[in-house]
């Protein structure tokens, strides 16, 4: 990912525009979530071969004062672009926007993206649509995010807002001055671990990687921290020995990093760590004990049901045998009575 640039943002009117119809151009900071970048890259990979760029809608949140926009999700919008005209499926965009806002009521429309760094007249037309009243972001500015997706090159990202410009009101409808604004790609620890796992597969022939367990991930993180500490130690030693030039900014950064470390004695850290390990072992032992008791209870219940079923079957068979024996004795008595009657006759 390309490094971010520094901007000096001056808000000023750039052209004639009706009062109350122009979005504000106050200083703005844009925060981009990694999943939004991945969604844009996936859309770029699925584009038609004859398309130079694809566009889509940006969704996210906006701070209460409107000075910070966080881009969280995106969706693609179909469009056809030639040298003379551009056609955008605005009806599809409106329906998809309503669906996304219904599923995620905390998100709002914040702008649009394009997979090309070029800014032209068509970009101004689309920008004016997204920043307009009604279905646009008005009175807030619409963010235009450009993501360069040229094969073999680094992914370059730029963020812009626009101000109206034009000699007449008619020309202002298809014109806009794009103003670059600072942006930041922000991710948490879980997202960072996922990105590192994905990046580890880029050098493999199979383009696949294994997901580490918690213990393996902890071991890997500790090894990385130890490696960084060794690298910093070597740099400090080289500066002390006047083998490398000193950097005031780097020294201040290291000083601030050391100030964040808790001032605890190593013996206290070791004692707390051992206590934590013992607590974890106790919890694990109790969990295994409960699991074993549950398995024994299930097996005992199953055994009782099995034994109870077999005993009931044997008892029912004995009762049927007794009833059969009684029936046989009754038949013998009736046969003897008939024989006695025949003899008397």
From Swiss-Prot:
Record domain MPN: where: 30-166
Entry's localization field: Cytoplasm
Keyword terms, alphabetized: Cytoplasm, Initiation factor, Protein biosynthesis
Bias-annotated ranges (Low complexity): 312-321
Residue ranges of the region described as Disordered: 310-345
Cellular component GO terms, alphabetical: eukaryotic 43S preinitiation complex; eukaryotic 48S preinitiation complex; eukaryotic translation initiation factor 3 complex, eIF3e; eukaryotic translation initiation factor 3 complex, eIF3m
Molecular function terms from GO: metallopeptidase activity; translation initiation factor activity; translation initiation factor binding
Main location: cytoplasm
Biased composition annotated in UniProt, kind: Gly residues: 322-331
Complexes and interactors: Component of the eukaryotic translation initiation factor 3 (eIF-3) complex.
Role this protein plays: Component of the eukaryotic translation initiation factor 3 (eIF-3) complex, which is involved in protein synthesis of a specialized repertoire of mRNAs and, together with other initiation factors, stimulates binding of mRNA and methionyl-tRNAi to the 40S ribosome. The eIF-3 complex specifically targets and initiates translation of a subset of mRNAs involved in cell proliferation.
Family listed: Belongs to the eIF-3 subunit F family.
Listed name of the protein: Eukaryotic translation initiation factor 3 subunit F
Organism the protein comes from: Aspergillus fumigatus (strain ATCC MYA-4609 / CBS 101355 / FGSC A1100 / Af293)
